[in-house]
């Protein structure tokens, strides 16, 4: 972002944006994993092209061991680059994301993940789009390579106000088919686990995309903490609650967790497309790991 535009940002947003950009620039693992000639979003092409000498930084999985054994030097296979991939982020800004048992809420981490997806796509010159839904707003960025528009979208996300706690987002709880996304796009569905079960229309629609469910999980969602002596603020009930972690509470939590997991699997049956991000872990590291796992599937 230009110096004049950067000057217009408030200090908090400017600091957050600079931190995201510098983290991406400073992460050598990104360039090592993806290579300079192809996008991490595309993976490698499937059509074989030729064999070339292996150089430092190339993907070790591409080594042609037969040619290497015959010639005595490391050689790797080259593949024809896959067609253009459009990256589309669907961010459902549900009030439940405002929960967090630690220093960061799930919403803060979700927004950071969305920003990394936008910035990384801009760096790789991919077309990227976004649909940001909440109970009060619905904002859409049509797929673009325009870096200025992408940076403006990152700033908008960083400055976005949390939705009202007492206004649940019905569109977030029961996802509907999103129109206007080019077929074959990589769709990152960043949201809480949907309610109910997917409709036949959803199943038919999702087959046209590389659709990956991404949710942020707090440690308290996995298990009941041993120490619940301190009062807890429930963002959905909008009140302070006190709980005693006895056997009955743990049993109820276990039932809730199991039911939630069943819903998660019903919406994303393929375990390779279900991605859980730990609210306490580094968002960028988790995001790159998710993309690299998807790259191996291609």
Task: Give the positions of each predicted feature.
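Exposed, interaction-prone extracellular/peripheral surfaces
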Residues: 1-40, 50-58, 67, 76-112, ...
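N-terminal juxtadomain amphipathic helix
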Residues: 60-62
